[in-house]
Amino acid sequence: MVTFYGKTFASRLLIGSALYPSPAIMQGAIRAAGSNIVTVSLRRESAGGKTGDAFWNLIRELDVAVLPNTAGCRSVREAVTTAKLARELFGTSWIKLEVIADNDTLQPDVVGLVEAAAILIKDGFEVFPYCTEDLSVASRLVDAGCKVVMPWAAPIGSARGITNRDALKLLRDRLPDITLVVDAGIGAPSHAAQALELGYDAVLLNTAIAKAADPVAMANAFRLGVEAGRTAFEAGLMNARDFASPSTPVVGTPFWHAVS
């Protein structure tokens, strides 16, 4: 079980709703993933039009929690305005906060992100900030009132997996009471498993499932990867070693096997 702002969910896999070949495949993938939380973009769908109504009905049929995002916003003002519109439209105080600084890398504007988070939290929002793996940025977000922090594994859509394991591990070690979600850059179920093995509470992804040859099958694979990673973390992974360590004890080895 994982908790976000006082609400508890069974699945540790959060999934996006964009880029799927069809609405039916999107629904099938979300079901196969077992996800309880789906991200939606206000910029992509407008509930005021026929397309928006149809999309919203599909999401409602899934009986999942909705996490609106501010994807595409490049300023504090734009992100705050989009968040307020999303709250009115979707009826939730949750917001996945994105403030983008660079078009090529889609790297977060960390200064603007912290500023926007502080504004929204004062206005009653429960913020899920998309950030880099920088500890100082994450700490500032926590100081602003965020109870969830979502560092990237790698740039959005890159499918490169965890590129800075040490930094992500440091975040987990230094922020033990904060819900941490790896968001962006996940390309394979093994990447998701690695994040959960580090002690992260969940992962959020979209492209790796939506752009797979078989999104529904891939969603199931990610579900299994997340479950395996969390189970491994709870079981207690052995520490890595620089040198070999025999798995077979030498005590009691027959003398004729001894090395002279």
Swiss-Prot record:
GO terms for molecular function: thiazole synthase activity. It comes from the Bacteria. The keyword Transferase applies. Gene3D superfamilies: Aldolase class I. One of its GO terms (cellular component) is 2-iminoacetate synthase complex. The keyword Transferase applies. InterPro entries: Aldolase_TIM, Thiazole_synthase_ThiG, ThiG. Keywords: Cytoplasm, Schiff base, Thiamine biosynthesis, Transferase. SUPFAM superfamilies: ThiG-like. Its EC number is 2.8.1.10. 1-deoxy-D-xylulose 5-phosphate binds at G157, A184, G185, N206, T207. The active site is at K96 (schiff-base intermediate with dxp). GO terms for biological process: thiamine biosynthetic process; thiamine diphosphate biosynthetic process. HAMAP family: ThiG. Homotetramer. Forms heterodimers with either ThiH or ThiS. Belongs to the ThiG family. This is Thiazole synthase. The lineage of its organism: Bacteria, Pseudomonadati, Pseudomonadota, Alphaproteobacteria, Hyphomicrobiales.
